[in-house]
Amino acid sequence: MDESALLDLLECPVCLERLDASAKVLPCQHTFCKRCLLGIVGSRNELRCPECRTLVGSGVEQLPSNILLVRLLDGIKQRPWKPGPVGGSGTNGTSALRAQSSAVVTCSPKDGPSSQGGPQPRAQAWSPPVRGIPQLPCAKALYNYEGKEPGDLKFSKGDIIVLRRQVDENWYHGEVGGVHGFFPTNFVQIIKPLPQPPPQCKALYDFEVKDKEADKDCLPFAKDDVLTVIRRVDENWAEGMLADKIGIFPISYVEFNSAAKQLIEWDQPPGPGVAAGEGALATTPSSTTTKQPDGKKNTKKRHSFTSLSMASKASQAAQQRHSMEISPPVLISSSNPAAAARIGELAGLSCSAPSQVHISTTGLIVTPPPSSPVTTGPSFTFPAEAPYPAALATLNPPLPPPPLQAATPTGTAVAAAAGMGPRPTAGPTDQTTHPRPQPRPSVYVAIYPYTPRKEDELELRKGEMFLVFERCQDGWFKGTSMHTSKIGVFPGNYVAPVTRAVTSASQGKVPMLTTGPASRGGVLANPPSTGGPAQKPPGNGVAGGPGVPTAVVSAAHVQTSPQAKVLLHASGQMTVNQARSAARTVSAHSQERPTAAVTPIQVQSTPGQSHHPLVSPQPPAPLGPPAHAAASGLGRVGGPLACATAPASIPAASLEPEPSSRPATLLPGTPTSPDSGSAARPDKDGKKEKKGLLKLLSGASTKRKPRGSPPASPTLDAELGAELSCGPPGPPCACPGPCDGDTMAPGPQRRASSLDSAPVAPPPRQPCSSLGPAASEVRPAVCERHRVVVSYPPQSEAELELKEGDIVFVHKKREDGWFKGTLQRNGKTGLFPGSFVENI
């Protein structure tokens, strides 16, 4: 090992400068340069080891020197250095390099190494090319190079060339005798490589700490600050330096350059944790070892700007090698409970990204997103001639979010069954600890249009596909458009995951017919191969069994649900109710339950529970009114669940309960027969009604625009428009046809009488318009008194302004967590998030 390679190892871990005899060793046996230790004492009024955070009681001057370091430095100065054909005997490395560089000016290139070697390192300090710099990056010419183009650097064999910068892996820009120019890499042998860019990172958000005493080890910074990365602390935290301050910071708040990625990768804790970079970055040969000539002519053009590392983008030029080479960061579940709690505390962090707090059905919470490692996977393009489901068959579904603590007592069984489908089954420990990293970025489709309001935001067009690299804590996604290739952030509740639609009879999925009259009416039927008495439920066609408890549905993470698979049309067009259902599908930890014969969502149950697809031998039923209040029939504890059938035009609807963690049971429906629909209308009338409803729904969805920042769920506006188009505001709409899994037979039918026996009467239902074939019985309105626990400023005219302590009479609880009620203070009626009130 020569002197230069050894000195590269003897560097201060903080400032990365080479250590000298003045370096001090701490009681923990870590060695740092004296300048860094004095800077730490001056900024923090105490001395802690930057490596292990051990408190040092004595001052910097009282610390001992590193004896081993002093002996190594003395041995390097006294031992003759014999690097080969370049150096001369009796010289140390510094004087040899000075002699070789000054030979360009003082003597001929060939006798430079022998005539300029001297024992005193300062004898050649007058040479212009190396004045004031002990060592310059340089290379020795192996062959003569005459240059082929203007701007090329001409040199002869044996010349010492001062390296200025590296254009790419094949070309350098250097200087010989004051003449600058380009020359090929394989014509020279690198003696002293160019310095690597320092490991740095750029802040994406503000990172502040309110309790400075409790979080004194944290390093606060503002957005766009550039930090020097020191090391990785654990899976989710790194240590860095900003100005003269040293501390730890969350990895997910910054973006690393290539050098920092290598440092983070090397310091990765052992175990199956996710790496913070895109993998180990391969450096160029000239930056690590002496480059040997390949013996072949260079065929690559010098300005091709080929990548300096395996994971860098091909469009990055080498002139910008000292700039920030940014790649999407990674959100990793921390193995340190204190670090994870520090990230999750709502009052502890302030983030400059939009909407740090999102509203879920359980209140104001901050939930960490699942791990989303950034990989350099291939770009996903969908050929125009390929069918839509076939193009999606190769894509992996997104990871499930960690289960909320407000889940039902059967959350363990729910988590155990969350792995059904094409993925391997995940046990309860997988759901509560760290999810497995997905092998490639997730693919999402925009279900609502979104106009960007900041420079780093992406414009969303309905039906547009996106590759999501990162799911931020505030509910925003970072990804790239598969149509425009632009990279930016966008609200996560405006997109839905695109998952593979693989059906299997053993998994109990409900198939959906996309052609023929059955799909026109929205009736679902089993394939002939899966029919038979063994798979047909008795009575009303709903899989029997006791009440299936349901879990809380978090509205902020519906887009990461791998279980609620919504089958999208190839045309990309969706009705309002369909888009609402797609945006509010149940997350991974929620228990799937048997529903009416309108849902194509994968049905799965706990072990031992019978589960069957639904069979409907009848012809399609006429279109009913919008069933956007399907969850309003969910009773309280012990109450039955009344499922409303969705419109026939909706191919993918999700019948969800109201946001509550209380269990619900299914109503035992009344057996039906093909003769039960005696008041059926002709199919032609059904088509007309369907077209009319589509016009109403599409008009309601296009007239409304998303609200201002932070973007709330666009389904609120869409549903409000649908309510206004159906009739005056009031009790929720009810399905005129049979529910609870009954076949869609036309005609006026009443629900099961057990609905009246519920301990608490469900909200009343009434028909939305005259489109339905019949009207169900109107029940008197039941209002519930709620008290406002957190003030809420309205985001639109349809919302109520809530002040803490106000009394609100709730008329309706919607499935997306929003309530409709009347404020006692001023008598106004409107919408408000249910997590801001409590029942009294």
UniProtKB/Swiss-Prot annotation:
Please tell me where this protein is predominantly located: cytoplasm
Q: Source organism's superkingdom?
A: Eukaryota
The segments labelled Interaction with RAC1 in the record are 292-362
Name of the protein in its database record: E3 ubiquitin-protein ligase SH3RF1
- Catalytic activities: S-ubiquitinyl-[E2 ubiquitin-conjugating enzyme]-L-cysteine + [acceptor protein]-L-lysine = [E2 ubiquitin-conjugating enzyme]-L-cysteine + N(6)-ubiquitinyl-[acceptor protein]-L-lysine
Note what the entry says on domains: The RING finger domain is required for ubiquitin ligase activity and autoubiquitination.
Q: Where's the SH3 domain?
A: 134-193, 196-259, 439-500, 781-840
Keywords carried by this UniProt record = Cell projection, Cytoplasm, Golgi apparatus, Metal-binding, Phosphoprotein, Repeat, SH3 domain, Transferase, Ubl conjugation, Ubl conjugation pathway, Zinc, Zinc-finger
Q: Which GO terms describe its cellular component?
A: cytosol; Golgi apparatus; lamellipodium; perinuclear region of cytoplasm
Q: Has UniProt tagged this entry with the keyword ATP-binding?
A: no
Q: Which Pfam families match?
A: SH3_1 (PF00018), SH3_2 (PF07653), SH3_9 (PF14604), zf-C3HC4_2 (PF13923)
Pathway participation: Protein modification; protein ubiquitination
Q: What EC number(s) does this enzyme carry? A: 2.3.2.27
Name the segments for region: Disordered.
Answer: 105-129, 267-324, 394-442, 516-545, 578-633, 652-723, 744-773
Q: Quaternary arrangement and interactors, per the entry?
A: Interacts with RAC1; in a GTP-dependent manner. Interacts with MAP3K10/MLK2 and MAP3K11/MLK3. Interacts with MAPK8IP; this interaction leads to the PJAC complex (POSH-JIP or SH3RF1/MAPK8IP apoptotic complex) with a 1:1 ratio. Interacts with SIAH1. Interacts with HERP1. Probably part of a signaling complex that may contain SH3RF1, MAPK8IP, DLK1, MAP2K4/MKK4, MAP2K7/MKK7, MAPK8/JNK1, MAPK9/JNK2, AKT1 and AKT2. Found in a complex with RAC2, MAP3K7/TAK1, MAP2K7/MKK7, MAPK8IP1/JIP1, MAPK8/JNK1 and MAPK9/JNK2. Found in a complex with RAC1, MAP3K11/MLK3, MAP2K7/MKK7, MAPK8IP1/JIP1 and MAPK8/JNK1.
